[in-house]
Amino acid sequence: EIDLSCSNRNGSFQISDTKGKYWIQNNKFEGIGGRVDWKDRGWSSDSVYANLSIFSIDVKESQFKADSVHFYNNKSFSFPVIGEFLNKAVSGSSAEHYPVFKSYKKDIVLYNILPDVDYKGGYTLRGKDFIADGRGDASARIIINKNGKKILVANSARFSIKKNIIYSESAAIKLYFDEDSMYHPSLQFTYSQSERKLKLYRDKKGVSGAPIYNSYHQLTIDAELIEWQIDEENILLGSLPSTSVSNVNFESIASYNDELYHSLRGIDKVNPLMRVSNFVKSSGTTNFSSAEFADYAGYPLHQIEPYLMNLSNKGFLFYDVSTNRAEVQEKLYNYINSRLQLADYDVIRFKSEVTDILGDNMIVHSRLNISTKDLNINGVESIDLSNTR
């Protein structure tokens, strides 16, 4: 057995305790066994490392890749994880991103990756950074607990976990208070362990334009920002301090607006709500892909995706652009039944308008007390109610 060192003018990497053959004619080393570690990233060679099986190195290249390695991180878990390994001979800031290990499995469970925070999904170690990797199907899951009960579940294709911060550009969020919850399919997610604070940002103009759903109060809420210091009772809903006047709308999922119903149709022969409802009846599922719906509707896929996104932004369904899947919401059926006079409806809407904006802090429009479930809304000048049919 030998210790193998590979270097160029940009950097180097090492493989210890390996053996193999070097083929001069094609400049390749074919190895069996050996160990690689993360010693250059500050961890001891017996705490974070990978054992190699069969591998090949093209000495004309500056990188080395190995499949089916057994990875160990004794700081995080007590079992080996099988996956692929990559290292490059690079210098400067690029060197911080190597070595890389990526697990094959996407259902690895790690408890207390931070205090009261569990993880399930794929495992990637890029340099010194743990990447919670769900790949393309948003299967990486962060679970935050409080007093032994889960208070938040976040699903994403990827979470970045650095020191005391967990971040995702887009995560499906379910925030629990007892048996009820607030839900949104795509929010920017930040959790600070040092502050024990959760921040959820919703881009009203982007793919996350759908309103937030509150199951207890049966409301949709188009707040831009949710903040919660999880040791406190109140969840804050509001917006960023970017304008002189800030508005947040709260709307009953049993509400109906005839003008909105007709505006959805445009020049279409069939109202989109009816088309989706008919598809659900024929397919037998409320969760479907954009490709499945495009095939049913007879439209090209590039037209169906914005079609579904528009319905999502108005709260009739949730549409996940990372997976191109839709989940029909109760509001869609309420609208159809109200239009056909098959059910009662209301026009309960609250418009919260805040004008006394000071400083750079969050503009608070509403507070939800997780114990009493009271929802206090600021800046409501009037409430218009109608009689149910």
Positions of PLM-derived features:
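Structural signature for solvent-exposed beta-strand/loop edge elements and short helix-capping sites
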Residues: 1-389
